[in-house]
Amino acid sequence: MKKIILISFLLAFVLVNSAKAAVFKLPMDAVKEEFPDATEVEIKNVILTPEQVSEIGKLSKIKVKDRLISFYLGKKGSEILGFGVFDTHIVRTKPETFLLIIDKEGRVKDVKVIAFYEPLEYLPPQKWLNLMKGKELNDKLRLKVGMPSITGATMSSQAVVEAIRRNLAIYKVIFGENGK
């Protein structure tokens, strides 16, 4: 009987730990990888006004949860190469953090998952995240409209698409059409 209990406990421990989440990269390391030609990465903290929150909600059709936003500007001299923003949101019951890179025209340049605390089988694959590249804030940037959903990771894919819509709208309100 003790052996069965011990084996059951060990099996449960292995299963729980195999489904545990992961932190894939340190945030600044991820930003530096995305801007390899940058001579500096400037952090620009923005506190959104109520008017900006309202405008972002209208543009993205997604509720803004945080008013403090930090953008990471990859710069080479005085030239801005692109903009990075981290987004942490709840997928089902646990958080996911990804880094969204936005080009100067307001399009998605890249998306990288930094940390994922749900079971890893719910993690959107990088191949699917790569479908975001070149997307801009419009009605096609929606799950099942311009983006395929992921079987077995529908909530994860929905959370990512909504967060990208929200952050592209934040970018547009803060930096305008051409990142100025």
Q: Where are these predicted regions, by residue range?
A:
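Flexible, solvent-exposed loop/hinge segments and secondary-structure transition points
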Residues: 19-147, 154-158, 162-180
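Bacterial N-terminal signal peptides
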Residues: 7-16
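Positively charged n-region of N-terminal signal peptides that target proteins for export
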Residues: 1-4
